[in-house]
Design a protein with these regions (language model features):
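Canonical tetratricopeptide repeat
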Residues: 51, 55, 62, 89, ...
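Residue at a conserved register position within TPR or TPR-like alpha-solenoid repeats
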Residues: 26, 60, 94, 101, ...
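TPR alpha-solenoid repeat register
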Residues: 52, 86, 129, 166-168, ...
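Structural motif corresponding to the intra-repeat A-B loop/turn of tetratricopeptide repeats
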Residues: 29, 63, 97, 140, ...
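N-terminal leader/linker segments that initiate helical-solenoid repeat arrays
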Residues: 14-67, 85-88, 310, 314-316
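Residue signature of alpha-solenoid helical repeat architecture, marking inter-repeat boundaries
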Residues: 47, 81, 88, 107, ...
Length: 316
């Protein structure tokens, strides 16, 4: 169920141009506490404004205040039982609450399934809720209703709505069911059909999980050829360093990453230095490895993994 987390949070932000549209900037800047205060005050004066109430639930969700979010979405479901998004969000926060308290999780499962299935019934085009159902039924144990057959049913519904989502969902199902060849087939179909970075990333992670680093690197190179993202240079270097393969290519890509680095790339340069240190450690080039690990530690001194790598280098 952990894989559902982003489905609960990503769809939260649905803004409207009203007297409280200033909340949009608070969400964009991740100032969820301020958004909560703003919306609470607004709702005190406008208690029947369902959009404001929904946004308050979203603010609670982003802050992982699951109990408060549950209360808000339950109120919305009671106010409008035919709103698919309300059911979807209610099921989502119940799921997150269940993840935090495994002892009570079984008690939430019935309501979670009902909420997602109700959302799917109300909105035949609701992609997110079908994704949630695919993952829910795969990850639940069979004795509480888990079912690959049901998961595949919703994957097929996804494919009818969006071939890419359907292929990714089927790839996920087969990967979870430990059928990597079928998972690879569907991830490749998703790449052919859509070719987004997400599609490539799913296949890359599958190859890594199957201990196929050379295939992973080849796939990342294909993604970079199409999307031309500097972050993909880091990914190539990471795989090369972790699996001790294609070290020259990995080193070259990491230097490109560092040279062209910007905050948008996501991974701090310190991690690229760490990967370079790993590569030089594989080669047993102690001086070069120390040079790069010291650069990594200087930039991010609190990372324990960097310090562990330095101990390994000093032992060369």
């Amino acid at each position: 169920m952990k894989k559902i987390i982003f489905l609960f949070l990503c769809p939260f932000l649905v803004f409207c141009q009203t007297s409280f549209d200033g909340v949009e900037s608070l969400f964009e800047n991740k100032q969820y506490g301020k958004a909560e205060v703003f919306l609470s005050e607004f709702i005190n004066k406008n208690p029947d404004n369902l959009k404001a109430i929904e946004l308050l639930g979203d603010a609670y969700g982003h802050q992982k205040k699951w109990d408060k979010a549950i209360d808000v979405y339950e109120l919305l479901v009671k106010a409008d039982d035919n709103n698919a998004n309300y059911h979807y969000k209610y099921g989502g926060v119940l799921g997150m609450k269940a993840l935090e308290n495994k002892l009570k999780a079984i008690g939430f499962i019935g309501d979670i399934k009902y909420s997602f299935e109700k959302a799917a019934e109300l909105d035949k085009n609701h992609i997110d809720t079908r994704w949630a159902l695919v993952e829910l039924y795969m990850e639940l144990p069979s004795f509480v209703g888990g079912s690959m057959k049901k998961s595949m049913k919703y994957a097929q519904e996804l494919e009818n709505l969006s071939k890419v989502d359907g292929y990714l969902a089927k790839g996920y199902i087969y990967e979870y069911d430990d059928e990597p060849e079928l998972a690879e087939k569907y991830y490749k179909m998703a790449i052919t059909e859509g070719g987004s970075l997400t599609c490539y990333d799913k296949l890359t992670k599958l190859y890594e999980s199957e201990n196929k680093p050379k295939e992973a690197i080849k796939n990342i190179e294909s993604a970079n050829k199409k999307h031309q993202r500097n972050a993909l240079h880091y990914q190539i270097g990471k795989v090369a360093a972790e699996y001790n393969v294609e070290l020259h290519k990995g080193e070259k890509c990491l230097h490109i990453y560092i040279k062209n680095y910007s905050a948008e790339d996501g991974v701090p340069k310190a991690w690229a230095y760490y990967r370079l240190a790993q590569i030089q450690t594989h080669r047993k080039y102690k001086a070069q490895a120390l040079k790069y690990i010291n650069l990594a530690i200087t930039e991010l001194p609190s990372i324990k993994l960097f310090k562990k790598q330095k101990v390994e280098i000093l032992a060369l």
